[in-house]
């Protein structure tokens, strides 16, 4: 009986559960970025622009009001992932990182180029505020990636604890819904989903197995986004930018 009980508890990943689904949340930090704007009456660049994410602080109230509220499913920064386990240590996955990117108001940056009758000279500065412009991807800096993952079991853990280290490579596309208000041009925002660029990333983390079916993962990711075709107004003005990011995430998953 003792041996049979031990065998029952000694689950591992050599099981018929080939597919898995995860859902969770993320936090980001972003590098500074040069943002290039172009349209029929403007062509200018804002240099070294700072941006942040918008994840809400986790409190008992926000946990149930925001994070676990089905009616506000897109308000937090979320992760969704479906993976196929080829064998015990290799998987392919389709991953969605629903991140948010907001250019910080009340910062002063260098500017070059021109808009309407305004010409920036060498070393001119521009104060960023809603009276000038507001720029964000908050209905999603949505990164859809294909991932290749390897797992490495961590041995000699106490009791029945099962833990693995994983590392992955990801590449994909970025489909933001950019909320850009070009106040100084009198233009309203486009406010539509649009294929705007590409993403490359690498990540690593720990996977905790509660059973054959249920698990949790913590991960740290670094990536680079190249947005070559951001739509900034209803008349289809454009912007482009590149930036690096770091992401920490917590997800919960089910194998099936």
Indicate where each model-derived feature is located.
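Short loop/turn motifs that connect adjacent beta-strands in outer-membrane beta-barrel proteins
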Residues: 7-18, 88-89, 153-165, 210-216
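Predominantly the C-terminal beta-signal and adjacent terminal strand-loop region
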Residues: 33-36, 44-45, 205-256
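Outer-membrane beta-barrel translocator domains and adjoining extracellular loop/strand segments
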Residues: 34-40, 105-111, 177-187, 229-235
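Gram-negative (and chloroplast) outer-membrane scaffold detector with strong preference
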Residues: 81-181, 253
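Flexible, solvent-exposed coil segments and beta strand-coil junctions
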Residues: 55-63, 121-130, 179-187, 228-233
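Extracellular loop and loop/strand-boundary signature of outer-membrane beta-barrel proteins
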Residues: 65-68, 130-137, 184-193, 233-241
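Short glycine/proline- and aromatic-enriched beta-strand/turn motifs that initiate or cap beta-hairpins
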Residues: 5-84, 176-178, 249, 253-255
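Residues that define the transmembrane beta-barrel architecture of outer-membrane proteins
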Residues: 17, 74-78, 138-144, 163, ...
């Amino acid at each position: 009986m003792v041996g049979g009980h031990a065998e029952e508890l000694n689950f591992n990943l050599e099981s018929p559960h080939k597919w898995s689904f995860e859902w969770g949340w993320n936090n980001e930090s972003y590098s500074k970025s040069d943002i290039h704007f172009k349209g029929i009456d403007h062509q200018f660049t804002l240099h070294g622009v700072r941006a942040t994410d918008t994840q809400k602080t986790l409190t008992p109230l926000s946990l149930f009001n925001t994070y676990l509220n089905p009616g506000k499913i897109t308000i937090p920064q979320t992760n969704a992932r479906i993976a196929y386990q080829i064998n015990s240590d290799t998987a392919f996955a389709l991953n969605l990182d629903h991140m948010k990117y907001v250019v910080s108001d009340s910062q002063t940056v260098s500017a070059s180029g021109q808009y309407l009758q305004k010409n920036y000279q060498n070393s001119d500065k521009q104060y960023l505020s809603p009276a000038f412009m507001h720029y964000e991807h908050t209905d999603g800096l949505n990164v859809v990636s294909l991932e290749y993952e390897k797992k490495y079991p961590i041995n000699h853990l106490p009791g029945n604890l099962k833990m693995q280290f994983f590392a992955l490579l990801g590449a994909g596309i970025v489909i933001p819904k950019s909320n850009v208000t070009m106040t100084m041009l009198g233009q309203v925002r486009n406010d539509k989903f649009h294929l705007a660029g590409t993403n490359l990333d690498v990540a690593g983390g720990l996977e905790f197995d509660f059973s054959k079916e249920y698990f949790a993962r913590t991960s740290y990711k670094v990536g680079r986004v190249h947005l070559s075709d951001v739509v900034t107004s209803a008349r289809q003005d454009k912007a482009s930018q590149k930036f690096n990011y770091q992401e920490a995430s917590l997800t919960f998953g089910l194998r099936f």
